[in-house]
């Protein structure tokens, strides 16, 4: 399926679940980007998850997002439980605008959710010749050494910087040995995962 055709189909699905066309388009772009860069655990495999969260009212399809400008360099966004892609899109755009004006841009977002690849947003800033750092929290998924129960989030971190060439440096990772997206893909495709990256009831 061609990328444009796929995007149209994803937009239709999101609109069916109540997203505006603009928010559906932003979300579709992020999902397709994940597929194109090979991060399948953050691509189309997540589409059902987002739709389910809308149905369960975890995600607000019609959010009233509020942006508060703290200073010339800092903004705070209350995303009103919007789909994460929309909140992240607003956040990186605001950070870029601040940085271009004052040399640094900082944006904090609350009341949002899973937004896919941090690298997708870092790349947008790097294309504007900006160094970027993105941090987010996550629910418990990582067990401390010797434990069987999750305590820490994967808490993804992302760094991006121009390199002077067409290929920027972008590191999008988490504090866990493997991201949950890869575990999800392996489970769905009945594939084995490397030893030592996950725990069951026996350790």
Label the predicted regions:
Residues 1-17:
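Generic N-terminal amphipathic, Lys/Arg-enriched alpha-helix
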Residues 21-32:
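Short, well-structured alpha-helical segments
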Residues 43-96:
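Active-site cofactor/substrate anionic-group-binding motifs, chiefly glycine-
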Residues 22, 36-47:
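N-terminal amphipathic, basic helical "cap/leader" segment at the start of enzyme domains
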Residues 142-203:
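Phosphate/diphosphate-binding glycine-rich loops and adjacent basic-rich segments that engage nucleotide
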Residues 1-6, 59-62, 196-203:
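Histone-fold modules and their flanking histone-like tails across chromatin and transcription assemblies
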Residues 75-164:
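A generic, well-ordered mixed alpha/beta core segment in the N-terminal half of proteins
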